[in-house]
C-alpha cells in the first residue's frame, strides 16, 4: 500500500476567467514510505504548485491526494493544521522567519507550541544547529543574518520536529556548495535511518543525484522518470545531466 497516492490531480488558476491557466494537468503517481523523490522541470512547469498542493498549503481544483488512505483534499482547515504540525516539514525558497524572534526561538517555535520541555528542546536544537553551521548565530535575529544563514535556520525549523514527510522547494538555493552537500547528506541519513519521506524540487542535477527517483515535469504533467535503483551516485548524476540537457532545462 502506497504512503501517498496522487490521482488525476489538476490545478487551474482563474478557472472561470477569460484566460484560465492550467498549472497541473491530471497527474497520477504514487509515493512509497521512505521514498526520496526529486522533481525537476523548466520554470512554470508546475513543480512548486505540485509541492504546495501535496503539502496542503495550496488547494487542487480536482483530484485526490491520499496520505495513509486519508484524502487530504477533504480535510478541514483544523485537520490540515494538525497534519502539518504532526507529520509535515516544509523547506521553501522564502525563509518565512519571524523577525521579532531570535534564530533559536524561530527554530524552537513548533516545539514550544507542542509544550516540549526545555531540556528536550535543547537536545534537539544543538546537534541540528551544529550540523547546519548556525550554532554561533542562534541568539541573533533574522535581520542580523545572511540569506544563507536564514535559509539554514528555516531548514532547522523544518527538521526539528522529525517530520514523517519533508517537502523542500529549492532547499539549497541560498547555500554554498559545502553546506548544500552537507544538507543533502543529512537528507540521505534521515531518509535511510528514519525512513523519512522526502519530496524535493531542484534545478541542480548534483543535488538531484542524492535522491532515489527523479520526475521531470513539463506543462503541468509528469514527462519523464528516472529511478536510481542500483546505480552509483556518479552514474545516476550523469544520467540526470544527460536527460536535463536533452530537455533543455
What are these regions (language model features)?
Residues 3, 12-26:
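A short, flexible loop at the N-terminus of ABC-type nucleotide-binding domains that lies
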Residues 55:
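Helix-to-loop junction immediately C-terminal to a conserved catalytic motif
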Residues 141-145, 149-151:
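Conserved ABC ATPase signature
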Residues 160-164:
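A short, proline-enriched helix->beta-strand linker immediately N-terminal to the Walker B motif
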Residues 166-169:
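Catalytic Walker B motif of ABC-type/P-loop ATPase nucleotide-binding domains
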Amino acid at each position: 500500500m502506497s504512503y501517498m497516492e496522487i490521482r488525476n490531480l489538476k490545478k487551474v488558476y482563474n478557472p472561470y476567467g477569460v484566460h484560465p491557466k492550467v498549472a497541473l494537468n491530471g497527474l497520477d503517481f504514487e509515493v512509497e514510505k521512505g521514498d526520496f523523490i526529486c522533481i525537476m522541470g523548466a520554470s512554470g512547469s508546475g513543480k512548486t504548485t505540485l509541492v504546495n498542493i501535496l503539502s496542503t498549503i495550496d488547494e487542487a481544483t480536482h483530484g485526490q491526494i491520499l496520505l495513509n488512505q486519508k484524502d487530504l483534499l477533504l480535510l478541514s482547515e483544523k485537520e490540515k493544521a494538525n497534519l502539518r504540525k504532526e507529520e509535515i516539514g516544509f523547506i521553501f525558497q522564502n525563509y518565512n522567519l519571524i523577525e521579532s524572534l531570535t534564530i533559536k526561538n524561530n527554530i524552537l517555535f513548533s516545539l514550544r507550541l507542542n509544550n516540549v520541555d526545555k531540556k528536550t528542546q535543547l537536545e534537539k536544537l544543538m546537534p541540528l544547529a551544529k550540523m547546519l553551521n548556525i550554532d554561533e548565530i542562534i541568539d541573533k535575529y533574522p535581520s542580523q543574518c545572511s540569506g544563507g544563514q536564514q535559509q539554514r535556520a528555516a531548514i532547522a525549523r523544518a527538521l526539528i520536529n522529525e517530520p514523517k514527510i519533508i517537502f523542500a522547494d529549492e532547499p539549497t538555493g541560498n547555500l554554498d556548495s559545502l553546506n548544500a552537500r552537507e544538507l543533502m547528506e543529512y537528507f540521505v541519513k534521515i531518509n535511510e535511518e528514519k525512513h523519512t519521506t522526502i519530496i524535493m524540487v531542484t534545478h541542480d542535477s548534483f543535488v538531484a543525484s542524492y535522491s532515489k527517483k527523479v520526475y521531470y515535469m513539463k506543462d503541468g504533467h509528469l514527462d519523464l522518470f528516472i529511478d536510481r535503483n542500483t546505480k552509483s551516485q556518479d552514474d545516476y548524476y550523469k544520467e540526470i545531466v544527460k536527460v536535463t540537457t536533452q530537455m533543455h532545462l
